[in-house]
């Protein structure tokens, strides 16, 4: 293999050379942990390797060794700890090079370090920040963690932060890096960079699912005034039909009483076995037999009809919850049933 080609090896080619260098026994044990597709791709690369000089083999083995060590350091104490150890052992430039490749392959998200911090620590930092900064940080955190923080913000700020998470699309790496840098100083952690999709309605739904019912109501009521369409879209996604499995038996029975049989039939037609089992367990035996018989002879159904039927059932679930007749489990353990 020409020297010029060696300097431009791809990750797949390096993996192939590493397997060859490790020998048959070790390579065979590695293969046991790969998928069929990965084995096929790797074998194809190995078959294309002609000759590699010892120096290049040693460089690839050393590179693999350094990355493996770095990954171990990350699992022990995060990127910050890994960076400190590698810089001390290998120097700043080499450590940075290794971590850049590793974080790229691991797809480390921005603010990954913040997931290890207590919600109170993050709250102390962000509560005086602009709502857009709060939204950016919360959109990257674990939903339960973000929900706890959102619950503690001033009520007049909560809805605005939730709205900004919902309408957030892409954020430039420069802004992410700057916010991370400041947060790093406060929490003694590290940052990563790249354009990353964040925010959106799904993100705010996950966050709101992590707050208590009172906080959720306050935020949604405020959003109803600011942006009714957005509030309605968020409500639709707060509880989906499949979430019926999280309700207790009494709640499911109450829902069944209010829904139209045709809507329930359509919804169950394409539902998972888990959903069907839980719903059937809360019906009379005669009703179950009737439903199963009708489902068996029901022809193909349009996805749009199913989604509309499930949406109507979800609306009933939310109305029953708002009326206090059923309870939907929330994050934070604040839903007390007496």
Curated annotation (Swiss-Prot):
The keyword rRNA-binding does not apply. Keywords: Bacterial flagellum, Cell membrane, Chemotaxis, Flagellar rotation, Membrane. One of its GO terms (cellular component) is plasma membrane. The keyword Cell membrane applies. One of its GO terms (molecular function) is cytoskeletal motor activity. The record marks 164 as: Part of the EHPQR-motif. It is found in: Cell membrane; Bacterial flagellum basal body. Belongs to the FliG family. This is Flagellar motor switch protein FliG. The lineage of its organism: Bacteria, Bacillati, Bacillota, Bacilli, Bacillales. The gene is fliG.
């Amino acid at each position: 293999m020409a020297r010029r080609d060696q300097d431009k090896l791809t990750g797949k080619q390096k993996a192939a050379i590493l397997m060859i260098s490790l020998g048959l026994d070790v390579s065979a044990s590695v293969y046991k942990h790969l998928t069929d597709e990965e084995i096929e791709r790797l074998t194809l690369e190995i078959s294309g390797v002609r000759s590699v000089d010892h120096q290049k083999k040693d460089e690839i083995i050393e590179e693999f060794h350094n990355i493996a060590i770095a990954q171990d350091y990350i699992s022990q104490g995060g990127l910050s700890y890994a960076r400190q150890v590698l810089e001390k052992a290998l120097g700043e430039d080499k450590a940075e090079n290794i971590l850049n490749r590793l974080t790229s392959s691991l797809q480390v998200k921005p603010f990954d370090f913040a997931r290890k911090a207590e919600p109170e620590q993050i709250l102390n930092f962000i509560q005086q920040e602009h709502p857009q900064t709060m939204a950016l940080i919360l959109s990257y955190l674990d939903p339960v963690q973000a929900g706890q923080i959102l619950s503690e913000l001033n009520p007049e700020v909560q809805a605005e932060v939730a709205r900004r998470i919902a309408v957030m699309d892409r954020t430039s790496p420069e802004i992410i890096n700057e916010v991370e840098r400041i947060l790093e100083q406060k929490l003694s952690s590290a940052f990563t960079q790249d354009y990353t999709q964040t925010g959106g309605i799904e993100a705010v739904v996950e966050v709101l699912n992590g707050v208590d019912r009172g906080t959720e109501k306050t935020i949604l009521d405020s959003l109803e005034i600011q942006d009714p369409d957005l509030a309605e879209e968020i409500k639709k996604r707060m509880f989906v039909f499949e979430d019926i499995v999280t309700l207790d038996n009494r709640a499911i029975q109450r829902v069944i009483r209010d829904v139209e049989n045709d809507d329930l039939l359509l919804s169950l037609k394409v539902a998972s076995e888990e959903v069907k089992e839980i719903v059937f367990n809360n019906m009379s035996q005669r009703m179950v037999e009737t439903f199963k018989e009708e489902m068996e002879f029901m022809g193909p159904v349009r996805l749009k009809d199913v989604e509309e039927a499930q949406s109507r059932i979800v609306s009933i679930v939310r109305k029953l919850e708002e009326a206090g007749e059923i309870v939907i489990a929330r994050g934070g353990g604040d839903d007390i049933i007496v």
